[in-house]
Amino acid sequence: MPMEFRGRATALSANGFAAAAQKLGTKAPEIWAVLAVETSGCGFLPDGRPQILFERHIFSRLTKGRFDEGDICARTPGGDGPTGPHQYERLAKALSLDRTSALKSASWGIGQIMGENCAMAGFPDVQSMVAAMSETEDAQLSAVANFLIASRLAQSLQAHDWTSFARGYNGPGYAKNNYDVRLRGEYAKASVGQTPDLDVRA
């Protein structure tokens, strides 16, 4: 695994995007809608580490509550704090307690795939997933496509059934975050050409 989660941090390529779209059976706007809502379409922090969100309730469940305490391990969601480097501070605390469970308790990359879903994303273990996520946004998006197919959410994306997609991808509390509404809005913008220029991002 790359030291401190730093790999090549290569930006999304046109070929990588096209491969994911073909795998999913969608066009560009559907994919950009998801990526825009999850990470504003960027899978890496400025320092080159993958975008993550550490989720304390997942860590609590995976460790059977052995470390329940404050912001890194609790039965209830929340306590995330700001996005960005702060999430790695939280992850570091969890890593010192149970490394594998900690990696599984964070969502990773451009589509924020949970580490515990590594198998559905196409990896033999979470360590392999994190290593790939640290290298390229192409690998991050490929993992998203694999997960959507394995979870049968690809059909909802193809049909623009944003409510069903939001429920499956974001969880039962999706409405609190207006997740489906935001997806619909981002899709509308992407459908009229408001999408990132991959050549500029490269």
How should each PLM-predicted stretch be described?
Residues 1-196:
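Catalytic glycan-binding domains that act on GlcNAc-containing polysaccharides
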